[in-house]
Curated annotation (Swiss-Prot), chains A, B:
<keyword id="KW-0648">Protein biosynthesis</keyword>
<dbReference type="GO" id="GO:0005524">
    <property type="term" value="F:ATP binding"/>
</dbReference>
<dbReference type="InterPro" id="IPR012340">
    <property type="entry name" value="NA-bd_OB-fold"/>
</dbReference>
<dbReference type="InterPro" id="IPR002312">
    <property type="entry name" value="Asp/Asn-tRNA-synth_IIb"/>
</dbReference>
<dbReference type="InterPro" id="IPR004364">
    <property type="entry name" value="Aa-tRNA-synt_II"/>
</dbReference>
<dbReference type="Pfam" id="PF01336">
    <property type="entry name" value="tRNA_anti-codon"/>
</dbReference>
<dbReference type="GO" id="GO:0003676">
    <property type="term" value="F:nucleic acid binding"/>
</dbReference>
<dbReference type="GO" id="GO:0005737">
    <property type="term" value="C:cytoplasm"/>
</dbReference>
<dbReference type="InterPro" id="IPR045864">
    <property type="entry name" value="aa-tRNA-synth_II/BPL/LPL"/>
</dbReference>
<keyword id="KW-0963">Cytoplasm</keyword>
<dbReference type="GO" id="GO:0004816">
    <property type="term" value="F:asparagine-tRNA ligase activity"/>
</dbReference>
<dbReference type="Pfam" id="PF00152">
    <property type="entry name" value="tRNA-synt_2"/>
</dbReference>
<keyword id="KW-0067">ATP-binding</keyword>
<dbReference type="GO" id="GO:0006421">
    <property type="term" value="P:asparaginyl-tRNA aminoacylation"/>
</dbReference>
<keyword id="KW-0436">Ligase</keyword>
<dbReference type="InterPro" id="IPR004365">
    <property type="entry name" value="NA-bd_OB_tRNA"/>
</dbReference>
<comment type="similarity">
    <text>Belongs to the class-II aminoacyl-tRNA synthetase family.</text>
</comment>
Length: 454, 454
């Protein structure tokens, strides 16, 4: 019976006592005296290792197995033996062992205390460390949980285009495509998309509920621990849903994906808690159980001004209606004022994107950011401007190229009653759920200014 | 009770008789005499429309509702009435109706007989047609079914990087990124990736089973109905799996996703069968039930040569060992010789990529293509070269830049016993399952040479 390590530990393993099994795995460590040796094995299915005990009087090739180095690939046949008094509840008594492929002696990451920067420089090998095993397994759980939530709620996944001829999507610097054979491949200057929202709106007006889950690109030169040039976004868009209804969906989605990790990745979370943040699991459980607070932007400004009055020091203490809140202000709102997730809502129009619905006060737009302790902004969303005339006016005010947005404006001419949507930076979500501090450690092969290895 | 149309028809709707419900939807058509009118409504949840009957003696705003144009957004309250003798099993007797947003008169796609080219020029509106509703819903089912299969089988989803400094991934022309502020943003010339396979191998050596599902880019100027500049690929990679084991996984995956569509999208398939290919459903059922054939490349060459000898005319009748099979030859193999999916395997090394495992005959590599009736190649895969020396030699023979591939070569130094993987062009899969002839009609906003609208 060939088993994966996860299959062994995920069942009532008492029943496995005395069973003969086969396992293919990599050696994590190997120590031997002259008569008995211990292989610690991992096959990638689990953070848990399986210990295999080999004895000189049981196998013919004791010397060969004793020479298996870290990350050698091996195939082991053995009998499961319960070890109730040991740290591990069971081990494998080796009957037969073969080295499938020896490993070179200079494996770079054999030292467990390597710093994150060194691991980043070895992004092809870092998934073999416990830390990156844990992070990337949680990441995979989050990704599937997003698709699962969307599928359960009848959202169709949408592939938004990545090449765009439109430089006016309203979010930062874009990458451009070089000419090909001395001509523009697409017939005009082409950028890499920074959002799939505009196209998602077109599909929401036909399907009701859609979502994108794909890469986006931003040519930001910042070298902070919160920016990547290439990252993944989830952008749901719902027709017939207003700002408040959209916030409910954000809350349900965030809770669903965190619950999935709490259920599936207990072991990884325990490891990450130990390594990154001892309160990690409690923090996640609290999010799942809490009701997300909703606070008007204008009230947040008062709260922050009061905090300054009462002696709280921000780096930027100049608080006024119309300001773009800094990360420090956002974190104050969700970490100090309210200790948990907070939606701020109805921001001044001048600090938000052109497509957001103008409120009756003519000053603010129907927008919301979800602020999360330790991260700040995790989700940004809005109800979209549904009036052709108002949207056109706003585009003109901002001197945007109307022609390339005409199709987007035209959506408003054909029954565009209401649409709301939001964007989640997927790597921000991974940061939050894993407690990792640097966004470059949340994606397998990070791309940022000056960094393109692998 | 607010319901979606899909919820109405997906339940035992006899129970709904006499129930009062509310629905928000768009008008697909509206006709009235002076006393009675009929709204055909769709809310995007289903291909099925709901007919709502409004009467001048039941509602105050009969004239207003009678003026609702195609794609006007409306909210209707009414009572479900079963209509066993009509084509539709039920209708809505309107108690209250409001136009939420009128639609302009010049809706472009009001004619049902528009050709596909016109629809492509209106890619923002085409999801409102029955045809694109059906195609894109099937597409969404396929995408989720891929994630579902992978999750059930313990594969971790991997975000392969899209920016690459490596121009040697072995597949066609690439797009390059323009300099930014007069310098290379990433410090060296940067391309858009054509595959995530190399990075997937790194993760397979840590996790066992991984898969990518993301966009890839190819600067192909061809204007055929089978090429896009931007398309989506699924690339699973499995450690400890050989060519034959990999073919089993391909077969299971293809059957799983087709089964999902047969179960979830019966209505869409019936529509597509009527429109595209009357044998569509039978064809899909046959794939699910059949055992995929496996034929050696060298035997295929003999079969094709025999066909020519027996009078079959290919455009290219020159059949020899070492040739790259054309689409016509591939289709002969899966449509005429064997009427169903066929794996060809063990191709000559010179027509395949550098990373494929050299077979003992020194002539062929452990590669396979899955050929599907009506499409040709749907899947390409291989067992990877696991020997550092052989892989290095092959890179040198092909004059590839070793330096930027050193990390990939190095994987072989640390327990790289075995790895196999494959790639599925997602849009090819959608073509096959929907019976659509042009790949531009399988993706919401197609990008190809000269085409970048929306």
């Amino acid at each position: 019976m060939q088993l994966k390590i996860k299959e062994i530990f995920n069942q009532d393993y008492v029943k496995l006592e005395g069973q003969k099994i086969q396992i293919k795995a990599w050696v994590r460590s190997n120590r031997d005296s002259k008569k008995i040796g211990f292989l610690v094995l991992n096959d990638g299915s689990s953070l848990t290792n399986l210990q295999a005990v080999y004895r000189v009087d049981k196998i013919d090739n004791y010397e060969e197995i004793a020479a298996a180095r870290m990350w050698a690939a091996v195939v082991i046949e053995g009998v499961i033996k319960l070890t109730p008094t040991a740290k591990q509840p069971l081990e494998l008594e080796v009957l037969n062992a073969q080295i499938l492929k020896q490993s070179d002696e200079d494996f770079l990451l054999s030292n467990n205390d390597l710093n994150l920067e060194t691991l980043r420089l070895n992004a092809h090998l870092r998934p073999r460390t416990n830390l990156f095993h844990a992070i990337m397994k949680v990441r995979a759980t989050l990704a599937f949980a997003v698709h699962e939530f969307m599928n359960q709620n009848e959202y169709s996944w949408l592939a938004a285009p990545l090449f765009t001829g439109n430089d006016a999507e309203g979010a930062g610097e874009t990458f451009s495509i070089q000419k090909f054979d001395n001509e523009e491949f697409f017939g005009k200057q082409t950028h890499l998309s920074v959002t799939g929202q505009l196209q998602a709106e077109a599909y929401a007006q036909a399907f009701g509920n859609v979502y994108t889950f794909g890469p986006t690109f931003r040519a930001e030169k910042s070298h902070t621990n919160r920016h990547l040039a290439e990252f993944w976004m989830i952008e749901p868009e719902m027709a017939f849903v207003d700002l408040k209804g959209m916030q409910d969906i954000v809350e349900d989605l965030v809770k669903h994906v965190i619950k999935a990790v709490l259920e599936k990745n207990q072991q990884e979370l325990e490891f990450l808690a130990q390594r990154n943040d001892e309160n990690l699991i409690k923090k996640l459980q609290k999010v799942v159980e809490s009701k997300f607070e909703r606070i008007e932007y204008k009230d947040a400004v008062k709260i922050l001004a009061d905090a300054v009055k009462n002696g709280h020091q921000f780096e930027n203490n100049e608080i006024f209606f119309g300001m773009d809140l800094g990360s420090e202000h956002e974190r104050y709102m969700c970490e100090t004022y309210h200790q948990g997730p907070v939606f701020l809502q109805n921001y001044p129009k001048d600090i938000k994107a052109f497509y957001m619905k103008l409120n009756d006060d003519q000053q603010t737009v129907a927008s919301t950011d979800l602020l999360i302790p330790g991260v700040g902004e995790l989700v940004g969303g809005s109800q979209r401007e549904d009036s052709y005339e108002k949207l056109l006016k706003r585009c003109q005010e901002l001197k945007m190229p109307i022609e390339s947005l005409q199709w987007y404006l035209d959506l408003r001419r054909f029954g565009y009653y209401m649409s709301s949507g939001f964007g989640i930076g997927f790597e921000r979500l991974v940061m939050y759920v894993t407690g990792v501090n640097n966004i470059k450690d949340t994606i397998p092969f990070p791309r940022s200014h000056g960094q393109i290895e692998f």
